[in-house]
Each structure stands twice: as C-alpha cells, then as structure tokens.
Amino acid sequence: MNIPFHRPNIPRNLDKINTDSIKSGWLTTGSQVLRFEKKLSNYLLYKHVVALNSCTAGLHLALAAKEFSKGDKFLAPVLTFVSTIECGEYLGMSPVLVDCKRDGFLMDLNFIEDQIKRDPKIKVIIPMHYGGELNDMENIISIAEKYGLFVLEDAAHAVENSLNSKKEEYLNHAVAFSFYANKNITSAGEGGALATSNKKLADKIKKLS
C-alpha cells in the first residue's frame, strides 16, 4: 500500500494566480500577500496577520520584537519541535521545560504557575498545540495576565484551532502558524504567519521581517 506523506488540495486556478503575480512585477509582498493576510486575519479573528516564510520565523520575530533581555526565560513543553526552543535560545533566552500531561502530549498546566512563582526570570509561555490536541488557552492566558507574561502559541499544527474572546482581550499575545506541505493549510511547500491583535507588535514584526 502506498500512503502519501501529504496530499495538498491545489486549486484549479493556481497557474493563473502565479502568472498574474509574476506579471504584476511584485515578486514579494504584493497584492496576493496582502489579500492573504487580510483573509486569514478575518478567518482567525485576529486584527493583524503578518505572512512569513515559516512558523519558525514567526516564533523568532515575535520574541525579537518584544526585546527580552539575555538571561530571561521562557516556558515550553518537553515534547515539541526544535524551533520552539531554539528561537528563544538564539536571542539569549533560556528554556524552562514543562512536562507533559499523563493523558496527552501537551504541557501540564499544573506545573506552569509553580515554575513562574519560583523563577522571576520567566517572561514568556510558549504552549504548542499538537496532533489535533489544543492547549487550554483561556487558563494559560489567565495565568499570563496574573504575572504579566507574554504568550506565544506555537500553532504549527493548529491553523484552524477554535478561538475564544479571552484571546482577543489579551494583547500581550501572538500565534505562529506553519504552512508546510503536511499542515492544515499549505502555501506550495513552505510558509508561515504570525497573528496578533496588538498593532504595535505586528508593526514591529513587519519591520523585522
């Protein structure tokens, strides 16, 4: 049996879209990109979306835009892709790994607040959604609000995750998505985006990208 690694849904008019983009003279950040950012923003219910080349870029730029100090720390799950950790380490931050739940693959929220209380250098929570399982974001954001922490979701596996009003209210928050070939939405092999309702953060990420 031959089971494909992925089988993306390619629209019939893709050739025309590509040709029109090339003929426009805008080979980057053209009208198609702006249109995509607007449509994704409306779909995800975030006020701002920045199209990028990968989810990794989204994680990196979000942390860079916040200008954390070297030696600051971030919470991340023990089970995750290497980018979740390396983006912070590249900027001089240190990870504090949180163990998984006994009945799933996501970080155990029971450990989060204890870690924050013990270490004032923790400035960021990076939850990762995995394999169709979503973190309890309302609970995570409530903890982040209590301690003034930045929440950066690694949603490479969850571009179509359900959103709630609690997220919309909390501006110290961003979400990074992946459009790699085997993800929910693909952009011909590679791609990503960063979503946030914080205009200042979105503007800075656009400048950095």
Feature-to-residue mapping (PLM):
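Active-site phosphate-binding strand-loop segment of PLP-dependent enzymes
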Residues: 103-187, 193-201
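Conserved PLP-anchoring active-site segment centered on the Schiff-base-forming lysine
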Residues: 62-117, 126
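Aromatic/hydrophobic pocket-lining residues that form π-stacking "cages" and hydrophobic walls in ligand
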Residues: 84, 140, 205
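N-terminal "arm"/small-domain region of PLP-dependent enzymes with the aminotransferase-like
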Residues: 1-27, 31
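Glycine/threonine-rich helix-loop capping motifs at alpha-helix boundaries
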Residues: 200-209
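Structural detector of well-ordered beta-strand residues that form the stable sheet scaffold
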Residues: 50, 75, 96, 151-152, ...
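Glycine-/small-residue-rich active-site loops that bind phosphorylated ligands and cofactors
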Residues: 10, 28, 80, 103-104, ...
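Phosphate-binding glycine-rich loop
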Residues: 26-73, 87-91, 97-99, 166
